[in-house]
Amino acid sequence: MAQQRRGGRRRRKVDFIAANHIEYIDYKDTDLLRRFISERGKILPRRVTGTSAKNQRSLTIAIKRARIMGLLAFVSED
């Protein structure tokens, strides 16, 4: 017998930064940056977070700055 596919359309992810009208991503805003970091401390990709390319680039720069300044950890505290 042939197997049937199940499922529907997946919902498009919304850019959190654009939806909340955040114009500048500050490296000191660790609460915002933690939303885009995995449990292991890795930067989440665009396909997971739904951010635009422009916002993803500025997010990456802000996260790296915060890590160097000591505001965010490089790895998880496990």
UniProtKB/Swiss-Prot annotation:
Entry keyword annotation includes RNA-binding: yes
InterPro entries in alphabetical order: Ribosomal_bS18, Ribosomal_bS18_CS, Ribosomal_bS18_sf
SUPFAM superfamilies, alphabetized: Ribosomal protein S18 (SSF46911)
Recorded superkingdom: Bacteria
Gene Ontology cellular component terms for the protein in this record: cytosolic small ribosomal subunit
GO molecular function: small ribosomal subunit rRNA binding; structural constituent of ribosome
Alphabetical keyword list: Ribonucleoprotein, Ribosomal protein, RNA-binding, rRNA-binding
A single GO BP: translation
Keyword 4Fe-4S among UniProt keywords: no
Family: Belongs to the bacterial ribosomal protein bS18 family.
PANTHER family per UniProt: 30S RIBOSOMAL PROTEIN S18 (PTHR13479), SMALL RIBOSOMAL SUBUNIT PROTEIN BS18M (PTHR13479:SF40)
Function, in words: Binds as a heterodimer with protein bS6 to the central domain of the 16S rRNA, where it helps stabilize the platform of the 30S subunit.
Subunit: Part of the 30S ribosomal subunit. Forms a tight heterodimer with protein bS6.
Name of the protein: Small ribosomal subunit protein bS18
Organism in which the protein naturally occurs: Lactiplantibacillus plantarum (strain ATCC BAA-793 / NCIMB 8826 / WCFS1)
Lineage: Bacteria, Bacillati, Bacillota, Bacilli, Lactobacillales
Gene from which this protein is expressed: rpsR
